[in-house]
């Protein structure tokens, strides 16, 4: 697997450590007083303190589900997805899109959920029932 790098802004490092480190369980990497790296499910996430990018007032539709734009996230294994759902629900997470299955019974069937980090950045986590169908139409 090739590691993907994503960098964006957050409002502060304390709440960012709490969300990504404690809540999501991501291992912290290097940091300074203005940025922090996390192992985000095998990928490098670099979070920098600054003005947070505002979400669009216009959402997009995917399989008749309205999804926030922009958003980022990770494709994880089916079982890991449902373990994460249980963990987030036990912590009282408010979902933008509740955990659900899209494209059910069709190629690319996927479990998905959307929620915000503590800076208001929209995240999507999803899992494909058949991972080999990630790019299948």
Give names to the regions the model predicted.
Residues 1-14, 71-72, 76, 127-137:
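N-terminal beta-strand motif that seeds the catalytic metal site of vicinal oxygen chelate
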Residues 1-2, 65-69, 106-107:
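Short glycine-enriched loop/turn motifs at secondary-structure junctions
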Residues 9-52:
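Core segments of cupin and vicinal oxygen chelate
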Residues 15-16, 79-84:
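Short, conserved charged micro-motifs
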Residues 33, 40-42, 66-69, 90:
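Short connector loops at helix/strand junctions that flank enzyme active sites
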Residues 46-47, 53-57, 131-134:
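A short local loop/turn or secondary-structure capping micro-motif enriched for an aromatic residue
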Residues 60-75:
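Helix-adjacent hinge/juxtasegments
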Residues 85-137:
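Vicinal oxygen chelate
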């Amino acid at each position: 697997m090739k590691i993907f790098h994503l960098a964006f802004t957050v409002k502060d490092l304390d709440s960012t450590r709490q969300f990504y480190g404690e809540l999501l369980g991501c291992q912290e990497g290097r940091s300074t007083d203005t940025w922090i790296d996390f192992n985000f499910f095998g990928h490098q996430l670099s979070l920098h303190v600054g003005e947070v990018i505002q979400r669009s007032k216009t959402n997009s539709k995917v399989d008749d589900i309205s999804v926030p734009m922009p958003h980022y996230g990770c494709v994880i294994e089916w079982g890991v997805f449902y373990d994460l759902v249980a963990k987030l629900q036990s912590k009282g997470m408010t979902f933008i899109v509740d955990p659900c299955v899209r494209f059910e019974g069709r190629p690319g069937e996927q479990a998905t959920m959307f929620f915000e980090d503590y800076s208001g950045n929209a995240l999507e986590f999803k899992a494909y029932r058949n991972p080999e169908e990630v790019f299948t139409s």
